[in-house]
Amino acid sequence: MKGSCLCSAVAYEVSRPAAGLHIGLCSCRSCRKAHAAPFNVYASVPRENFRWLRGEDKTRIYESSPGKNRHFCSVCGSQLVAEYPGESNLLLRVALLDEDPGARPVEHIFRSQQVPWCDWESDAIARYEEWGPSGEPTARNTQ
């Protein structure tokens, strides 16, 4: 599987672990702030399954909490991976994959830190398939 940042300056490849891809959601404050989102979608992958294809020199590291390094693109700011140095796995940012990972989330951690305003399953939220060129939503999905 290949992934890239928003500006495409950084790209990577990751092979599926033999045991399958373990995907989770994290609602901790650190992930919410780092990703400017109500949660982060991650996959734990062995380091040996990951390699940079281009732009590794454009990555920067931020230690967001003691011992946790977040790697991001210095051009566009996209979060790429996180790691605890010395551990055998990396935390891949699933939303940056350029294809369907073929697995779905199996856990949601730090639910105690969820934001109260984000209930994307609520029937009160209108759903649209895309955003049109005129700046209007297109093809409302009522499901």
Regions found by a protein language model. Give the residues of each.
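A short Gly-Trp-Pro
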Residues: 1-143
